[in-house]
């Protein structure tokens, strides 16, 4: 069991097959848990009807994926607009919302370009803008830097920190120690169970990354013993 408090930035780590993506899919209402409960904002997501799931997902959750999931036939601006269009938001309000977040994500100068005209790091920042434009209760990120080079990954992770510092709750699955070190807490899972968790506290990223490495070594030792 674990909980995510409002305003937290949590990274989830574990070996391939440990259940990281399954966990994210259950929280995202894409899969249903075979046992237990998942509460988001006081609602048990497993109890939602099919008609309720779509609106809940649209209003309460934001998603950032490894492969960006942007539509090349839409401008970056229109890609960001998409969840607002689905919620029947007026164009003038959409413009205001994009105007608020574009400077924060440093994408103002690429809004009218298309995804194929910008870099991978810029694409991911557009994807983040699309994910947070509705001000979701929870932002879910699945390996958000997996398709990026080191420099672009650093920029994207600093972007996550910026939006988290503004109050956005973030839950991120990653295999990267460097990326996990940007989070305020790291949860380690194996076979669908929480094995360990560590808090960043006042540590800098380098110190926290070393603690994450040490935790992984410890857990791998447990795994080898079990095998």
Where are these regions (language model features)?
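The feature captures the beta-strand-to-loop junction immediately N-terminal to the Walker
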Residues: 13-15
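Helix-to-loop junction immediately C-terminal to a conserved catalytic motif
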Residues: 28
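Conserved ABC transporter NBD signature motif
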Residues: 36-44
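Short coil-to-helix segment of the ABC ATPase nucleotide-binding domain corresponding to the Q-loop/switch region
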Residues: 74-82
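Conserved ABC ATPase signature
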Residues: 114-118, 122-124
């Amino acid at each position: 069991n674990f909980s995510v408090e409002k305003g937290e930035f949590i990274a989830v780590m574990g070996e391939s097959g440990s259940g990281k993506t399954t966990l994210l899919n259950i929280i995202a209402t894409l899969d249903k848990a075979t046992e237990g409960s998942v509460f988001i904002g006081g609602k048990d997501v497993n109890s939602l009807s099919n008609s309720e799931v779509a609106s809940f997902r649209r209003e309460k959750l934001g998603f950032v994926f490894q492969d960006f999931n942007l539509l090349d036939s839409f401008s970056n601006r229109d890609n960001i607009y998409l969840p607002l269009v689905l919620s029947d938001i007026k164009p003038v309000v959409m413009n205001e919302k994009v105007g608020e977040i574009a400077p924060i994500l440093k994408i103002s100068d690429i809004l009218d370009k298309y995804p194929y005209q910008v870099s991978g790091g810029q694409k991911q920042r557009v994807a983040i803008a699309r994910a947070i434009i509705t001000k979701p209760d929870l932002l879910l990120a699945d390996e958000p830097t997996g398709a990026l080079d080191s420099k672009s990954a650093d920029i994207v992770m600093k972007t996550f920190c910026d939006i988290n510092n503004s109050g956005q709750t973030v839950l991120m699955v990653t295999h990267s120690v460097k990326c996990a070190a940007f989070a305020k807490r790291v949860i380690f899972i194996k076979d669908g169970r929480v094995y360990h968790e560590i808090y960043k506290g006042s540590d800098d990223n380098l110190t926290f990354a070393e603690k994450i490495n040490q935790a992984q070594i410890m857990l791998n030792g447990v795994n080898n013993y079990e095998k």
